[in-house]
Amino acid sequence: MHNSPLYAAIDLGSNSFHMLVVREVAGALRTVTKVKRKVRLAAGLDPEFRLSRAAMERGWDCLRLFSEQLQDIPADNIRVVGTATLRLATNVDEFLSEAERVLNHSIEIISGEEEAKTIYEGVSWTSAGEGNRLVIDIGGASTELVIGEHSEAKLLNSLHMGCVTWLNNHFGDGELSEARFAQAIAAAKAVLEKVAEDYCVLGWRTCVGASGTVQALQEIMLAQGKSERVTLPKLQELMGQAIACGRLDRLQLEGLAAERLTVFPSGLAILIAIFETLNIESMTLAGGALREGLIYGLLGNNHDCDARDRTADSLISCYQLDKEHAERVRDTAIEAFNQLQPAWRLSKRYGRPILRYAALLHEIGLCIEYKKAPQHAAYIIDNIDMPGFTPAQKKLLSALLFNQRDEFKLETLEKQGAVTGRQAIRLARILRISLILCMRRTQGTVPNFTLQAEEEALTLTLPKGWMDEHYLRASELRLEVERQQKMGWPTRLLEA
């Protein structure tokens, strides 16, 4: 089989240099290589904005590592960009001359506006969302704020504050105190003050974070047993934990990786300032940002499709699933959801989309074998890259697939963080019934049905005489009723 070409994006950031190498497979991107090295370029800027020789050497050493990977990739498939620190450096030409020689490739220093726009493109390709979306990316020397809808950025700014510069300015001696955090937050608010009104007037429906700070926050919250959604109270709690440590060299937070320790307090202070200034309710982690935006720019793909739809379509293609049958199960499950939504108060925003994808991907485990297909399906979802899905959404999807037939495994449904455990169980009950109704795998064979619920009691009503004419499905439905009743959920099967 002929392999599709490789594409590479390199981001010369103010804190770290990143390289992403991908291949396009079945309409989706497959990561081949990811390399990150902490260079702390911004820490090498003096008061006259000259990069120190040591900082430049750190950058060149990193690019020597990257250069080997680029040798077999066509030049037209590579994009290398520099961001905030290289925009500021007065001796940037000295750095670029050697950097381009090492890489054997040109380097673009992109404007703050272009950086913000490219970040938004990466987010729109890799993160799902409807309506206006606020994107926050806290870099080493700049912070990008973008509001957009679908693939269009409507309002964007690149602000002169970042986790490395705020580290130097406010936590340079390593002290972690209430006063230092207050100082750092106030300074960030002063920067935000100039643009805040524009963002509040335009408004947004969802907020996503695309930086290492937000990645670190999510890792901490999951390690500490919290949901993945970032809120101001959670940020303030983490600030309290950091202050309790007293000093940067004593900072220890459960879930915080050692490589993120140094710039975490400064990034946290900036994020608290953003939350308080813009009155943000909650935020989740974006699936991608600048590097992904650069890659999709090289590919020139259109943005008309939801990120999760692209991922599902790619998996259906890669695993050779029966798409016609999958869509039939999807339509049946969504009809069942819509009937039960008022009584069960099911989440249209968080529950319905994941039920939809569970229906579309329910046969993915068959690529391994039939008997344990639900477990195999859950394993695949747990361990595959799924652009557009947050970690909690992946866990819910995995739990639904794990519970699509046979005995219920409640712990998987209760441990995911996308919806409540009770809602997850109800979604699983809907999926299981929908799969049985679609067993014939033929268009026009799904019966008309009515689902009614009162608390956990569930009644499925089918056309009169249907069960006598469809013995196998009737038998499977009776077995399913027994399973659900065994769990303590009153379930009835009627004809009318």
Curated annotation (Swiss-Prot):
Taxonomic superkingdom: Bacteria
Disulfide pattern: none
Pfam family, one: Ppx-GppA_III
Pathway(s) of this molecule: Purine metabolism; ppGpp biosynthesis; ppGpp from GTP: step 2/2
SUPFAM superfamilies (alphabetical): Actin-like ATPase domain (SSF53067), HD-domain/PDEase-like (SSF109604)
EC code(s) of this entry: 3.6.1.40
EC primary class: hydrolase
The entry's keywords: Hydrolase
Hydrolase in keyword set: yes
Known catalytic reactions: guanosine 3'-diphosphate 5'-triphosphate + H2O = guanosine 3',5'-bis(diphosphate) + phosphate + H(+)
Gene Ontology process terms (BP): guanosine pentaphosphate catabolic process; guanosine tetraphosphate biosynthetic process; nucleobase-containing small molecule interconversion
A GO MF term: guanosine-5'-triphosphate,3'-diphosphate diphosphatase activity
Keyword Hydrolase applies: yes
NCBIfam families registered for this protein in UniProt: PRK11031.1
HAMAP family: GppA (MF_01550)
Function description: Catalyzes the conversion of pppGpp to ppGpp. Guanosine pentaphosphate (pppGpp) is a cytoplasmic signaling molecule which together with ppGpp controls the 'stringent response', an adaptive process that allows bacteria to respond to amino acid starvation, resulting in the coordinated regulation of numerous cellular activities.
PANTHER family according to UniProt: EXOPOLYPHOSPHATASE, RETROGRADE REGULATION PROTEIN 2
Recorded family membership: Belongs to the GppA/Ppx family. GppA subfamily.
Name recorded for this polypeptide: Guanosine-5'-triphosphate,3'-diphosphate pyrophosphatase
Organism: Aeromonas salmonicida (strain A449)
Taxonomic lineage of the native organism: Bacteria, Pseudomonadati, Pseudomonadota, Gammaproteobacteria, Aeromonadales
